[in-house]
Amino acid sequence: MDPPPRPRPHRVAVLLLLLLASSPAARAWKKDEFRNCNQTPFCKRARTRAPHSLDAPLSLDAASLAVATDGSLTASLSHPSRLRPLLLRLSALPPHALRLQIDEDYSSNTPPHRRFQVPDVLLPDVEARTLHLPQPKTSAAGVSTFALSSDVDVVVKHDPFELTVRRAGSGAPVLSFNSHGLFDFEPLQESKQEGETWEEQFRSHTDTRPRGPQSITFDVSFYGADFVYGLPEHGSTSLALRPTRGPGAEESEPYRLFNLDVFEYLHESPFGLYGSIPFMIAHGDGPSSGFFWLNAAEMQIDVLAPGWDGASSTENGRIDTLWMAEAGVVDAFFFVGSEPKDVIKQYISVTGTPSMPQQFAVAYHQCRWNYRDEEDVAGVDSGFDEHDIPYDVLWLDIEHTDGKRYFTWDHSAFPNPEVMQGKIADKGRKMVTIVDPHIKRDSSFHLHEEATAKGYYVKDATGKDFDGWCWPGASSYPDMLNPEIREWWADKFSYENYKGSTPTLYIWNDMNEPSVFNGPEVTMPRDAVHYGDVEHRELHNAYGYYFHMATADGLLKRGEGKDRPFVLSRAFFAGSQRYGAIWTGDNSADWDHLKSSIPMVLTLGLTGMTFSGADIGGFFGNPEPDLLVRWYQVGAFYPFFRGHAHHDTKRREPWLFGERRTALMREAIHMRYSLLPYYYTLFREASVTGVPVMRPLWLEFPDDKETYNNGEAFMVGPSLLAQGIYEEGQKSVSVYLPGEELWYDLRNGSPYKGGVSHKLEVSEDSIPSFQRAGAIVPRKDRFRRSSTQMVNDPYTLVIALNSSSAAEGELYVDDGKSYDYQQGAFIHRRFVFADNKLTSMNIAPKNLGNKKFSTECVIERIIILGVSSGSKKAIVEPGNHEVDIELGPISLRSGSSSVAPTVRKPNVRVVDDWTIRIA
């Protein structure tokens, strides 16, 4: 056999870079590797344009305004400085959503390429749900008005073009589009004009831009708003988006949405990270509102400080924003709601609700780059048992593969993967392996050979298979825009194709921004070409979305449609919530990254991605033991709860830091497991309504201004509030408890007044956390090895009475794994305490399906906070039998001595209707 060819010099250099890529020093944040606005021509052009500065602004042709047969409103827009007119389409979705679409009008001049409109993100029935708009009323002054609903109407000014969504009756504006005249729409061109240069240079990379500049810019204003939120993903300790331009702006760069592989990212920066969701929510004294732009090209968004336009005075309660995108079309949604939950629900109504996870996925995950071999896996697994720490999932990173060839195993380290998974599964646990999009260019690798033969790779600008570098070395990337290729990829997860996989193995998608080590900004060149002759610049932010989708579909097919997939993805886009979880990427083991994790996870929840979390302890670096403890105490509240670390870090399993700290981390994990019934119920709510599991305080207290920019405390559902500890050696913390009712300390039941801040002493054993008066929270208090082993355990109900001596809560239960719940196989109960009676009632919708679910689980304890301990008996109906009320522990945590009146062993089934009356 001939020796392998000698690598070309530039390949040798790149290989050296690749070998160094995993070095912390090599891959730490390097500002000059990534573009800023001034280095991004479309952003620089748009940012220098003054309001209403165009000589011939955008205008609407009144004669073209008409209601189409599908009920939408259409018109022609003219932009004299551009090549061809634009076509406007307005449509409505219930209850108060307006869709605005603007594209080039191709009717008179069809170019060789059309602008890309992102498919597959909106729910398939969005068009079918479109309402029939009435014929607008047009005034002599050139203003058209039509009703969006009984509460909201739309005003369209013709010349210059401006659109305003306002409250009907009062006429108060809620949102406006192009009120500052900043709209620009660069048309596709067939050839360069004289003197034009289309190519762009960044560092050593040239973007050929064969279709010329094609950016879009416009302004959107939010009225009655104190703050705006959203636009993940970026690192920040602020929940609200900070002004980026104008007097007193706290940032100098716009918020960038461009999915990138950023190692050890900055905790405080508007720079884009791994995912992009172009959705913004505004909240304040007026109605809540939201704006979503369906566009997968790079975006830059300015939040403009009052006076940004040089005006001597500013309109109170208005926030102006500037939206800039490199390519695409305008496909935007305006949402109006009486409160922020209404806005979230409307956004979810077009992009889809989060998928309902399996029960195990809501529990604790243990990960590291990398657990070395089967012996290491067995040792970690047994270590959790030996130290009485539950966990549900053990993860394997890239080193488990044969030379970074995904869907394979390194059989020298993992000779019996199915046996290994079986031993983990015997304890009710699962495993996860990593599958990234870069496919090793190796003629002996069947996946590469098949993808090459079928033409399934993304192409470079010359039409050849794109060849970039990532963990395996030379790599190519499947073109996930093509439905045929997604189907092919999904088939690779079958047991036949993924040898060594079992039904208890799930998947992790990393590096799917996509990451290309030798590419511009560590990603794919913008002039690479996808299915349908779509340039990568048009698709970039959705590549990871499609990869996530195809992987989830693969697990769905593997399970014959019966097993809910679990797929964690690093990259994401609007709609990714339908396919699984995400995490915040390569954070650092420092207090700042712990603090920034809360606004990041809250922002993800507001924009649909409720199943998210940050690496416990920080991915990069070695956390001080006290930091690691605090991170577990905060992270136990994340929707996605996983410990993870870089391979250059010291091992950090929870039992490696001394007996005291092990006990503290064990206690944090135990707390999460005891609250799994509550979390699972919240995930059910999210899967139906889109309301996130982990929430900003203002989502539950929308009228309380003290909550509007609180990014340190957070709600878990409607009933629990927690405040992290984010400083080393912190002795006290100020905690604001909103509302007029009491809050009860989760640890000891102590009551605290609502509507004020409390300065609390900090203890090492937990972070401040509280249950809201008026709430009932279900728990399971028997500690097991995994959540699977808790299935038949009894429940505890914790009732926190409000000033009316009342409380309520919910419990949702299904089989924790299948889709039978979609045919009615679940239990959904509401618990109501009033007039000294606790009542359980069924709230599951009828006629959902013919499948049933039942359980013999009972209520073992009912803890009542906020009541005197005078009563000694309770009467259970039906049956009219007495049970004892006695003082019992509020928490089963180690060393807890706090007690409260407790109904002991009423033993009523959660599936039944019943009443328990305090005698």
UniProtKB/Swiss-Prot annotation:
Which compartments does it reside in? Answer: Endoplasmic reticulum
Looking up SUPFAM superfamilies in the UniProt record yields: (Trans)glycosidases, Galactose mutarotase-like, Glycosyl hydrolase domain
Enzyme class, first EC level, given as a word? hydrolase
Which Gene3D superfamilies would you find in this protein's record? Glycosidases (3.20.20.80), glycosyl hydrolase (family 31) (2.60.40.1760), Golgi alpha-mannosidase II (2.60.40.1180)
Q: Which residues does the record list as glycosylated? A: N802
The UniProt entry's coiled-coil ranges are none
Annotated Gene Ontology MF terms?
Answer: alpha-glucosidase activity; carbohydrate binding; Glc2Man9GlcNAc2 oligosaccharide glucosidase activity
Matching entries from InterPro entries are given as:
Gal_mutarotase_sf_dom (IPR011013), Glyco_hydro_31_AS (IPR030458), Glyco_hydro_31_C (IPR048395), Glyco_hydro_31_N_dom (IPR025887), Glyco_hydro_31_TIM (IPR000322), Glyco_hydro_b (IPR013780), Glycoside_hydrolase_SF (IPR017853)
Q: Where is the active site?
A: D510, E513, D586
Q: Where are the transmembrane segments?
A: none
Instruction: Supply the alphabetized keyword list.
Output: Endoplasmic reticulum, Glycoprotein, Glycosidase, Hydrolase, Plant defense, Signal
Give the EC number(s) under which this enzyme is classified: 3.2.1.207
PROSITE patterns xref list = GLYCOSYL_HYDROL_F31_1 (PS00129)
Q: What do the Gene Ontology cellular component annotations say? A: endoplasmic reticulum
**BP GO terms, sorted:** defense response; N-glycan processing; polysaccharide catabolic process
- Pathway membership, UniProt: Glycan metabolism; N-glycan metabolism
Give the range the annotation lists for the signal sequence: 1-28
KW Hydrolase (keyword) present: yes
Q: Which reaction does it catalyse?
A: N(4)-(alpha-D-Glc-(1->3)-alpha-D-Man-(1->2)-alpha-D-Man-(1->2)-alpha-D-Man-(1->3)-[alpha-D-Man-(1->2)-alpha-D-Man-(1->3)-[alpha-D-Man-(1->2)-alpha-D-Man-(1->6)]-alpha-D-Man-(1->6)]-beta-D-Man-(1->4)-beta-D-GlcNAc-(1->4)-beta-D-GlcNAc)-L-asparaginyl-[protein] + H2O = N(4)-(alpha-D-Man-(1->2)-alpha-D-Man-(1->2)-alpha-D-Man-(1->3)-[alpha-D-Man-(1->2)-alpha-D-Man-(1->3)-[alpha-D-Man-(1->2)-alpha-D-Man-(1->6)]-alpha-D-Man-(1->6)]-beta-D-Man-(1->4)-beta-D-GlcNAc-(1->4)-beta-D-GlcNAc)-L-asparaginyl-[protein] (N-glucan mannose isomer 9A1,2,3B1,2,3) + beta-D-glucose; N(4)-(alpha-D-Glc-(1->3)-alpha-D-Glc-(1->3)-alpha-D-Man-(1->2)-alpha-D-Man-(1->2)-alpha-D-Man-(1->3)-[alpha-D-Man-(1->2)-alpha-D-Man-(1->3)-[alpha-D-Man-(1->2)-alpha-D-Man-(1->6)]-alpha-D-Man-(1->6)]-beta-D-Man-(1->4)-beta-D-GlcNAc-(1->4)-beta-D-GlcNAc)-L-asparaginyl-[protein] + H2O = N(4)-(alpha-D-Glc-(1->3)-alpha-D-Man-(1->2)-alpha-D-Man-(1->2)-alpha-D-Man-(1->3)-[alpha-D-Man-(1->2)-alpha-D-Man-(1->3)-[alpha-D-Man-(1->2)-alpha-D-Man-(1->6)]-alpha-D-Man-(1->6)]-beta-D-Man-(1->4)-beta-D-GlcNAc-(1->4)-beta-D-GlcNAc)-L-asparaginyl-[protein] + beta-D-glucose
Q: Describe its function.
A: Cleaves sequentially the 2 innermost alpha-1,3-linked glucose residues from the Glc(2)Man(9)GlcNAc(2) oligosaccharide precursor of immature glycoproteins. May be required for defense response elicited by pathogen-associated molecular patterns (PAMPs).
Complexes and interactors: Heterodimer of a catalytic alpha subunit and a beta subunit.
Record family assignment: Belongs to the glycosyl hydrolase 31 family.
Name of protein: Probable glucan 1,3-alpha-glucosidase
Species in which this protein is naturally found: Oryza sativa subsp. japonica
